Design a protein with these regions (language model features):
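Bacterial N-terminal signal peptides that target proteins for export
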Residues: 1-10
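Glycine/tyrosine- and acidic-biased, solvent-exposed loop/turn segments at the edges of beta-strands
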Residues: 15-157
Length: 157
């Protein structure tokens, strides 16, 4: 009986690690002085770090949001209540959908988007929240569809 119980426990552990990632077993850390809020699936849909500024709670540090089915949908960081650093989005199936970068709540730097099949859909840069420089788009088959150039959010070619 103990042998069966041990084997059953190991099987559940292996399936959890291999298939679901054991969200309840993951650890999440916040910057010093911040408090971890929310719950991951199956009991919740998001976790975030929070601190108080001027008597008001604001997000600061880790932020993760999951779909209704438990797949990770959004992952990023906040700094003093504003998006900061790298933000990733995922399709319901778990494949990456996009990576964007933020500074002080404003999109800044490289954007990369993917189709659900893994092919890159778009690549470009943001400057002060506006498209800037060369932007390229590809079809789901990997063939580039177009290329445009932006300056300060305006298409120039």
């Amino acid at each position: 009986m103990n042998r069966n119980l041990l084997a059953h426990g190991f099987l559940i552990f292996a399936l959890c690690i291999g298939v679901a990632g054991c969200k309840s077993g993951e650890t999440y850390s916040c910057p010093a002085g911040d408090v971890l809020k929310g719950e991951p699936p199956p009991n919740g849909q998001e976790v975030w770090c929070e601190k108080t500024i001027g008597g008001q709670p604001v997000k600061d540090g880790l932020f993760i949001f999951w779909t209704d089915s438990g797949g990770k949908m959004i992952e990023g960081q906040y700094k003093d209540g504003k998006q900061d650093g790298e933000w990733k989005t995922y399709y319901e199936t778990g494949e990456k959908k996009s990576i964007d970068h933020y500074r002080d709540g404003v999109q800044q730097g490289e954007h990369i988007g993917w189709y659900i099949n893994g092919q890159i859909s778009a690549k470009g840069q943001y400057k002060d929240g506006q498209p800037d420089g060369v932007w390229k788009r590809w079809g789901p088959d990997g063939i580039r569809n177009w290329e445009e150039v932006y300056k300060d959010g305006k298409k120039v070619s």
